[in-house]
Amino acid sequence: MAHKKAGGSSRNGRDSESKRLGVKKFGGEAVIAGNIIIRQRGTRWHPGENVGIGKDHTLFSLANGTVSFRTKVNNRSYVSVIPAAVEAK
């Protein structure tokens, strides 16, 4: 005869996979056109010059250059890419 009572199954024990959100390219980093700069939910950061936005609010570079972060008067954070041609001048 068994002397151990059958253990009940737990209702816990699951978790969703992390979505790997956040900044992928930081201020001052070089990017090429098409590089993902930020993955986000909603528009915590807004696209500035030479930055596009995907349908999932991902910000990506539209030109080769350097990433720049700044906050405007309306208290929104903007991400821009300063083109490489402008930097060289």
Swiss-Prot record:
Q: Would you indicate the residue range of the signal peptide?
A: none
* Entry GO CC: cytosolic large ribosomal subunit
Q: What is this protein called?
A: Large ribosomal subunit protein bL27
Keywords (alphabetical) are: Ribonucleoprotein, Ribosomal protein
Q: Which InterPro entries match?
A: Ribosomal_bL27, Ribosomal_bL27_CS
**Residue ranges of region Disordered?**
1-20
Pfam family, any one: Ribosomal_L27
Q: PANTHER family attached here?
A: LARGE RIBOSOMAL SUBUNIT PROTEIN BL27M, RIBOSOMAL PROTEIN L27
List the GO biological process terms.
Answer: translation
Residues forming coiled coils: none
Instruction: Please report which protein family the annotation says this sequence is part of.
Output: Belongs to the bacterial ribosomal protein bL27 family.
Which GO-annotated molecular functions does the record name? structural constituent of ribosome
